[in-house]
């Protein structure tokens, strides 16, 4: 029991001090003043235990007893006769802030957040944790070195990284332990930044009592200190208190100028970094996350930087040497107020999706204007320029987009929302509403073009929250009257990115619609655009004005002017740059001999149609063209054709060919499929533009016992992704039947290395999209592309038109390798060509080869000499502009013009077939493909001619 000896005259003063103390109480009973103090029992000391911990913190005394001493004027001696057992000690020092390098200290990385009841929790920040060998306490710091709190180790050491620790007002979890010297050094540097700042006090911190130990082991202290409250003073911050969040940058101009900002990534610690360009107002560099940057190829690095410049409204830089890599340097550029969107028109397979994801991730995490967002204490922006991004794409690509986000970023880093096909309309609207209003859960919404219309009302209400729009397969927006396009316009999203492989073929009206959506007003109104560009360019391309020098020069001038405007925000590269990254690809065009039933069907249809070539136009003859294309595939498709039923149903020979399923192309197809199945271990994709044709092919494959799957317009959207995945992963599936128009866009079918294009489409982009399904990133095997064409029929005319139709697209989208002024100025197939379109050449091995070459087809690559075609054309122009011409001279000029046109067509087709070998199977039995060569005996009578463009290596096994 502790006894206090006090003189009588000081009793009242002491009692007054005791009365004011919260530790002791003064009780007055029966008019007698008596002080009662706690009684100390002589038993082992039991230290306090933290809730949730099984470890005790014990006190180690410096003396076992305190004896009584006379009280001086300023001091009082306390004799606490208490026996304290020896044992583990409690460290009563302040929170650990000693961050010096200690070999016995372990370092960890951590993730922390505020406690939340959300279903999908996210971490708000990263930091470090330290653990000294002599301590059981983890100390937590944020990435700037600020102390967050501490927590005791769990009893089970195996659950160290699964335990959710409580540190101050945060939940903390260990990520991994730092082992590398460089990592430990970086952690020490980060923690040493705040060494001078005292750690925040906690309720468990106790103030130590200063004492002087005399010979008797006594503690002497002031009397007032003995009975006063033992409290901790509130920590007074050295910074001025504000009502704003401590990490928010002060908004006063004076503080903003004094604040120094730093990029999210240190450019000095990244190998070959990608540093974005900026304007003069930028406060910090934007550097592409090395997590993605290390996977980007050179053309993709340039693409990401180009798109960033466009969306940030930066003018195009002047690059003196395009071969020099400028992606590692940040250029200060002028602002371009006309531009806020970009059209990425790269060929299929160049990685447009990866480039887009890289741009999205960069804008979500970083911004060049750090003073406008919340920053850490060290001046690093905590949020990016964009918070909500809308991705609109065909429904077949929704799953692919989400997989790509997961592949490159991991969905734990970025929140990606897709609307389930099982949702009701109300559920979709609620999901979109929550996406826009809840900030941290999702950053990207991927939605199909059709679904966009059903949730347009919710998007319209909160359109100010959408920071960026991405439209995949953006050429779908070329129709100005489209509801989808008008819905997207109503959202008024400033930053827009359109992705497409073929944005334009031969229609400047569609081109204007797309460009005006990306950057509104950059081409003026449609009326002014039509007056300044469409009319002059169209007149220059009209064959009736081909010799009018004035019109041609004006058209060329307007074309150059348009190119100068659009190249500021359009990027177009061909897939030729992929040759060094992908396996070799062999292109084979096979001309298949038509069956006699097909020839009979052609004659009956053309006679029954009673064509008037004087009034014939392409639009009016479209039904007949479709019917003739079906005959090329199989005569059995004729009976169900609408045009045939309404115009030619009374022909005498209808039954002789309408019941026949055989055709030259079907014979070659089934022989190829059998050769691929028996001679290789590869898979094959068969593409057609008609589901009826796919039905016939599917029946033939079933009869041959060939396992396959099919994707066309009748397949529900929710099943398409699983069909593609099953084909790519299941080795038991041999074939994939694909509808070019319904499923040929954006699909990744790298499980197959051979593709057969059974029929052609007027639009070359449809066929190019379909053929690029297998030769793309992820393909490991050499690829073979087969195009089947019926000899001498409409199939060949379509092929010839396809070879030339890209001229306008190449001109305005910058395919420099194929750019040719003459090819861009002329429509190679005018109305007169329709007459030839409906003719059947039965006496030729290949009408296309007859147009361009007279070789013997021995498999040699033909070198074409440069022609004087342009000079001849200019001469004809000059001669045609004279004031008067006789009838004889006029007839002569017309004949020369016709000859000149034929020569031009031949020249352009030759240019498109450069590097192709010309093979006549009757003279040469090596077609540079083991499957065709091994099946040559069966195919010799079915293949009349072939164009082959071999890959880099010969796959023929010796």
Curated annotation (Swiss-Prot):
Residues covered by the Helicase ATP-binding domain: 333-521
Extent of Low complexity compositional bias: 202-212
PANTHER family: DNA EXCISION REPAIR PROTEIN ERCC-6-RELATED, SNF2/RAD54 FAMILY MEMBER
Protein name: DNA repair and recombination protein RDH54
Stretch list, region Disordered: 189-217
Alphabetical keyword list: ATP-binding, DNA damage, DNA recombination, DNA repair, DNA-binding, Helicase, Hydrolase, Isopeptide bond, Meiosis, Nucleotide-binding, Nucleus, Ubl conjugation
Residues given in the record as ATP binding sites: 380-387
Superkingdom: Eukaryota
Domain Helicase C-terminal: 665-824
One GO location term (cellular component): nucleus
Subunit structure of this chain's protein: Interacts with RAD51 and DMC1.
EC number of this enzyme: 3.6.4.12
Catalytic activity: ATP + H2O = ADP + phosphate + H(+)
Gene source species: Saccharomyces cerevisiae (strain ATCC 204508 / S288c) (Baker's yeast)
Record localization: Nucleus
Record-level Gene Ontology MF annotations: ATP binding; ATP hydrolysis activity; ATP-dependent activity, acting on DNA; DNA translocase activity; double-stranded DNA binding; helicase activity
Other remarks on this protein: Present with 1270 molecules/cell in log phase SD medium.
Family under the similarity heading: Belongs to the SNF2/RAD54 helicase family.
